[in-house]
Amino acid sequence: MCHAAPARPEGARGRPPSGDNFSGAARSKPVGAAFEQRARQFLERHGLGFVAANVTMRGGELDLVMREPDGMLVFVEVRARRSTRHGGATASVGWRKRRRLVAAALQFWSRHGAGAACRFDVVAFEAGRLAWLRDAFRTDDA
């Protein structure tokens, strides 16, 4: 199956402080979509083909599903943080999140990619920089 590898002052519009991440109900979806689009473009420039985005399966959501030229499915989690404090974007993919990603990926894989190898990557935006972690974790890590 799958394997291979401080608060700030209020904003100009009177918004409450958002901390050091990009969370916030009013902004989370558009901000997340923008980072997912940037991640997709980056991965496409590096030879991966787009398969699907924001796939909701029982147990979790897959931000991006891509395909390597050799046919391998790549399940991509996109994370963004303003700073690397508290571990940054990469560290925010903890064991609970990995477990949900694996559950969703197994369902997607069984419906759309059975027989293809697959892996889990993370594209992290931390303090304005993009980091691509290929084979960030495996199914037995979750």
Curated annotation (Swiss-Prot):
<dbReference type="Pfam" id="PF02021">
    <property type="entry name" value="UPF0102"/>
</dbReference>
<dbReference type="GO" id="GO:0003676">
    <property type="term" value="F:nucleic acid binding"/>
</dbReference>
<dbReference type="InterPro" id="IPR011856">
    <property type="entry name" value="tRNA_endonuc-like_dom_sf"/>
</dbReference>
<protein>
    <recommendedName>
        <fullName>UPF0102 protein Bcen2424_0290</fullName>
    </recommendedName>
</protein>
<dbReference type="InterPro" id="IPR003509">
    <property type="entry name" value="UPF0102_YraN-like"/>
</dbReference>
<feature type="region of interest" description="Disordered">
    <location>
        <begin position="1"/>
        <end position="27"/>
    </location>
</feature>
<dbReference type="InterPro" id="IPR011335">
    <property type="entry name" value="Restrct_endonuc-II-like"/>
</dbReference>
<comment type="similarity">
    <text>Belongs to the UPF0102 family.</text>
</comment>
<feature type="compositionally biased region" description="Low complexity">
    <location>
        <begin position="1"/>
        <end position="19"/>
    </location>
</feature>
